[in-house]
């Protein structure tokens, strides 16, 4: 019979079975207290195994639910405070309730009685267990002879299973399962399975040992042959060739190469070992092996995916470009989430590196290359830049075959060797300027490089073996994305870099360009002061660009002249104001267009956009006696000429409505001119300005001078959307115009313009040319239509008089 409650003594790493007599060492307070309680009562102690042996003070949840009830036979206290007890186990016990008394644990439980199985089955299992046990002893499992014989002589099936489980090196969980199994047949079967697994493990170990022995024998044989070869090589070529081969061999053994690569490289190394070091082919193989051992096959940097740090770096190095920064941070956020899921085993590790190839699109000097460098710094990766401008040979990407003299790997492999890691940020600059020739299409070669489904096994012609590019973060840049072949462009995600506004250029000049140029020209900040007004005039009158490269050059020129003044005139401080610029840099190089001073007949203010920014332009129309010819000047492109013809057709169609005599078109020549004739002009966006100027010239109604317009037109009078809204509006603002006509469908594009720059400006969004003429002409559309009505009335009266 079991007591109502029993003190619990947790044990670590072992399981006790009924009928066993064994000593227990107890050093933990929770165990010593339990033993004291048992001795004070009926000397019955419940011994239970811990699930985790690292837990120092176990609670009920840390213990298994089946233990062994034991009688304490003897107890001895040690000088260090620990105790040793001799116990005899007498029953399996399943705990029904735990009692946590603070300084020790107690439990209420019930005896887990043996369930005898089918006699024939039990007898067979007993025989099998003893056979496997003996087989293990023969395989070298050491047990004291008297212990082994005692186990083999056991007749009780229950005790046989328990004693075998106790003396074998089974896992704690397996031993506990044997303790928890009440059915004797099932318990024997569980022990039999464990014995067979142990025998299988021993057989596997024996097979491994045999393989290792054979490998050692083969290595010894190879070593012997290699030493013979070395001796022959020394006789033929001296010590230098042998040392070189050994050096390559040591480096290759230190590399964790894929099997296919190792096989090919060892073949080349063996060929090299048999050659004279000074032969031409040996030189080719030597260069090849040098490339192989210096490539980062498994060297990588650990990604730093701290978004706050990345944001700080982007803000530190670049002003503006908010959309670009947001997209870069989104890209890093996705990589971080993927990396966390891969660590949890939810997605394969290869999925982490899969993602869009970023394509930075924009005019020169707007920060495409520098932001790629900032991304590398934010990620903690190496940075490599390869310029593809003018590349016309496929071998520049894939490498040259080794049959050619002076063959080298392609730029991709060269860049990876330069980086020293297999996961750098790799910038492919000017990808839109790739050429094509009889030597192949490098853009087609890039398809394999940039395709995540293929670049895991990119084969450079020079290497001749696959190299994994899947961990490389490729970023491309381009000025004109329309020049990129469609299959290549399809693999990229374009991110547009727009030209900087004047305000952005001013901030960039103050924060980055001026301090950098001061440092490069050996000046201290207190030696030269450039006023904000001077910088603004420098931007508007001495540069015309989308980025800030020319601006930095002009600042550099300004500071060099200031440095000369400091030395020649002995000045301690030079202050450069707006008025001083001409003395330092000469007369202004660019004079921005400004609004006309008063309304004029036949002159409308349009807007244009180039990669270096936007501005206004004047569309001039003159009507003169002639034969109905349309004259177009000002270097107009084909599309702009078509817009002019469409404007003329619209004017003819609405001639009576606007009071224009139809015969005027046949008896007059119409001359359309767009000033700055040396500059080519193209695009459909001047359509509304052409119509306004043309109708004004034909009706002699002036066009307002304080309003600028842009938009494509149709023959039916619809106004269609155009591009470059931000640059055009900023150009108009710079020219002093505060009222702008835009297509209705371009209304969302205003969000790209900074809010402070939209203030004090009026925007009219139109869908039809009637709305344009109502806004652009003095007096509006009503005055124009009234003129038409008067003209038609006068014509009818004239016809009636002539008829009478």
Swiss-Prot record:
Keywords: ATP-binding, Cytoplasm, Hydrolase, Nucleotide-binding, Protease, Serine protease, Stress response. ATP binds at residues 362-369. One of its GO terms (biological process) is protein quality control for misfolded or incompletely synthesized proteins. Its EC number is 3.4.21.53. It is found in: Cytoplasm. GO terms for molecular function: ATP binding; ATP hydrolysis activity; ATP-dependent peptidase activity; sequence-specific DNA binding; serine-type endopeptidase activity. It holds the Pfam family Lon_C. ATP-dependent serine protease that mediates the selective degradation of mutant and abnormal proteins as well as certain short-lived regulatory proteins. Required for cellular homeostasis and for survival from DNA damage and developmental changes induced by stress. Degrades polypeptides processively to yield small peptide fragments that are 5 to 10 amino acids long. Binds to DNA in a double-stranded, site-specific manner. SMART domains: AAA (SM00382), LON (SM00464). Gene3D superfamilies: 1.10.8.60, 1.20.5.5270, 1.20.58.1480, 3.30.230.10, LON domain-like, P-loop containing nucleotide triphosphate hydrolases. It comes from the Bacteria. The active site is at 685, 728. Its main location: cytoplasm. It is an enzyme of class 3 (hydrolase). HAMAP family: lon_bact. Residues 598-779 form the Lon proteolytic domain. It comes from Thermus thermophilus (strain ATCC BAA-163 / DSM 7039 / HB27). Belongs to the peptidase S16 family. It catalyses: Hydrolysis of proteins in presence of ATP. This is Lon protease 2. Induction: By heat shock. PANTHER family: ATP DEPENDENT LON PROTEASE FAMILY MEMBER (PTHR10046). Homohexamer. Organized in a ring with a central cavity. Residues 6-199 form the Lon N-terminal domain. One of its GO terms (cellular component) is cytoplasm.
